Amino acid sequence: IKIAIIQMRMVSSRVKNLKNAINKIRIAHQKGAQVICLPELFLTNYFCQVEKHSNFKLAEKIPGPTSDIFCSLCKELKIILLVSLFEKKTAGIYHNTCIVIDKTGKIISKYRKMHIPDDPQYYEKFYFTPGDLGFKSVKTSKINIGTLICWDQWFPEAARLTSILGAEIIFYPTAIGWHPKEKKAYGKSQLESWISIQRSHAIANGVYIAAVNRVGLEKIGSKTLEFWGNSIIFDPSGNILARAK
């Protein structure tokens, strides 16, 4: 099986981000990828840098307009796709959600992020309710796929429970980076810690790990984060199979 993780640099235009994602999916498919994963909340800049009520308008239902687009794309290309979306479950309840779409164009799994951060410029608790669907592993025609999201990475129980459910590979759509003022003092150790925790999940659970991050500076008002990229795939022995810059 050949997988692809698509590291992206987001812009302020939702339409441009969507077009960029679709273009990169097509390129990955042309290179033989059968399972493809997009970064966390790839449609927009990382809006969780600020607490702003108007950002709730970015959320959508699942199934909804964006998932419908990717369902059609999966059916066309005969690929399996993991898509991270800002989900509106119902009035006042929103989730950070990852769906798995199979090659027939059907949504076969939905995972809602369980661990929600509330750190400076990662104000996700303002937006997201913790997941209510439990941990997920779904059998596909290619491989058993586990889905976790970003901050779930720092909790070994999440990877263990997902692997116990049968996952052979765990995908982590991610949005993580440096506060510019902290990068000089802590940047190297922060990145190394992030790499180490992914490797430990692979080794401890005997699974493949694929973490896909966004990359680049993102400024919202007076707030700035530098997303560090370094999307990475590990085999069950902790060897790096692929790593972006």
Where are these regions (language model features)?
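Short beta->alpha transition motifs characteristic of CBS
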Residues: 44, 99, 110-117, 232, ...
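A short, polar/charged loop-to-alpha-helix boundary motif
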Residues: 113-127
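Cys-nucleophile CN-hydrolase/nitrilase-fold catalytic domain and related Cys-dependent amidase chemistry
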Residues: 14, 25-103, 108-110, 176-200, ...
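Short, glycine-anchored, charge-dense loop/turn motifs used at functional sites
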Residues: 3, 100-108, 232-241
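N-terminal active-site segment of His-dependent metallophosphoesterases
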Residues: 1-34, 171
